[in-house]
Amino acid sequence: MKLAYWMYAGPAHIGTLRVASSFKKVHAIMHAPLGDDYFNVMRSMLERDRDFTPVTASVVDRHVLARGSQEKVVENITRKDREEKPDLVILTPTCTSSILQEDLQNFVSRASIETEADVLLADVNHYRVNELQASDRTLEQIVTFYMEKAKSNNILTKKTIKPSVNIIGAVSLGFHNQHDIAELKRLFHDLDIQINQVIPENASVHDLKNLPSAWFNFVPYRETGLMTALYLKKEFNMPYIDITPMGIVQTATSIRSIQKILNALGATVNYEKYIDEQTRFISQSAWFSRSIDCQNLTGKKAIVFGDATHAAAITRILHQEMGIHVAWCGTYCKYDEEWFREQVKGFCDEVIISDDHGLIGDLIAKTEPAAIFGTQMERHIGKRLNIPCGVISSPVHIQNFPLSYRPFLGYEGTNQIADLVYNSFTLGMEDHLLEIFGGHDTTEALSVGISADDSLNWSDEAQKELSKIPGFVRGKVKRNTEKFARDCSKNLITLELMYEAKEKVSS
């Protein structure tokens, strides 16, 4: 556990609650003190959803600490079973309530005697995993529970006559998740592949027994769904694809993988004509990447940071499809470091694996890229440094839960990404012209560091002179001047010192 005012991935119970609240008729009981129960507010604010968040907090208070939790937890489970009539109730502690070391499995066993619904305890180690790992594990746990139940009842499922697919990993609060799933459905329709099930978003737990009817499983995001796909592969020999169809190249690779699996299973399909037609005529990004507009971005410096799936995909797109120089890319998914490094090998100068936003901020300041592609935190950092930022990954705020159709996957997603990339760069002398003519976004000279450094002061005259320098080189001038001042052991940067630094650099 660590104290932080910003986390890229939240605590484990948030991942469990995201999966639970994605299913239909599943209710989650969160065994937690006040302060850990912010999920309801967060989901209600961000998700464009008409329904209430199906999560109830069983509050750990002084009475619970004195008498124990069993009576209260069991009462909350049975009460919600009567009121909501769910198919499944999931009990999850938080990292805080886990300290009590209570036998929650015993509470679940006791409650399940009195309830119509199934009752499960989320099998997650709250000290060792984060939100993303917990969501992956919880989804696998729920699927396993209902598949084992179906086996014990001798429920056998046959494969569908036509090729079909399960889409695994559509989770509440995902980044452009609903739009991506809609685009994937459209893609599979074009390929004449039936959708067997989409889980967990709007799925019923009673339908999970039909998952093996599909010919294969499709996992668009590594963060949630991979463990479920591996379980189904092991138990039912179901092949799965985990190549994210993001960008022209990876979308084609993903479709060819589908073609290979279907042909191996007895179908006869050839999607090469479809790939060619979509790439050349339907997707706008292929010709746009060869246009003079996009060629203006060739060699521009960018950095990428986000979850493993999105950061790896965007890095590939910037380098392969748009000719943009990626100075470094990184992910906060430290547990997936090996896969991430393999995916971005040769597409960037350096790989950063960290969940420390302070380190990431300082690296961005030092790199001085023309554009940032990251999370909500990188957007904040970009605003402080006056560097434009395109948001490409969770965690995000409400701007990235749009009502309009904005997928990142499939061929329509390539258009969305091309727009985002192009519009994220400050073009030509735009920044300088805004300052000259008193534009809407005139800013004072900003520091090129995020970490606090109060050892140097600028005189009013020096600040005024610095503000006259065009924005696209101002940061470099400021950094060189401050380096010169430190070398000279000066604490105050004056106009004279600025000119001395300029002469030193010029020579």
From Swiss-Prot:
SUPFAM superfamilies xrefs: Helical backbone' metal receptor
First-level EC class: oxidoreductase
Enzyme Commission number(s): 1.3.7.7
Binding site for substrate: G428, M429
Keyword check for Iron-sulfur: yes
Pathway this chain belongs to: Porphyrin-containing compound metabolism; chlorophyll biosynthesis (light-independent)
Matching Pfam families: Oxidored_nitro, PCP_red
Gene3D superfamilies, A to Z: 1.20.89.20, Nitrogenase molybdenum iron protein domain, Proto-chlorophyllide reductase 57 kD subunit B
InterPro entries per UniProt: ChlB/BchB/BchZ, LI-POR_suB-like_C, Nase/OxRdtase_comp1, P-CP_red_C, Protochl_reductB, Protochlorophyllide_Rdtase
Catalytic residues identified in the record: D293 (proton donor)
GO cellular component, one term: chloroplast
GO molecular function annotations of the record: 4 iron, 4 sulfur cluster binding; ATP binding; metal ion binding; oxidoreductase activity, acting on iron-sulfur proteins as donors; oxidoreductase activity, acting on the CH-CH group of donors, iron-sulfur protein as acceptor
Domain of life: Eukaryota
BP GO annotations: light-independent chlorophyll biosynthetic process; photosynthesis, dark reaction
Protein function: Component of the dark-operative protochlorophyllide reductase (DPOR) that uses Mg-ATP and reduced ferredoxin to reduce ring D of protochlorophyllide (Pchlide) to form chlorophyllide a (Chlide). This reaction is light-independent. The NB-protein (ChlN-ChlB) is the catalytic component of the complex.
Matching PANTHER family: LIGHT-INDEPENDENT PROTOCHLOROPHYLLIDE REDUCTASE SUBUNIT B
Protein's name according to its UniProt entry: Light-independent protochlorophyllide reductase subunit B
Organism encoding this protein: Porphyra purpurea
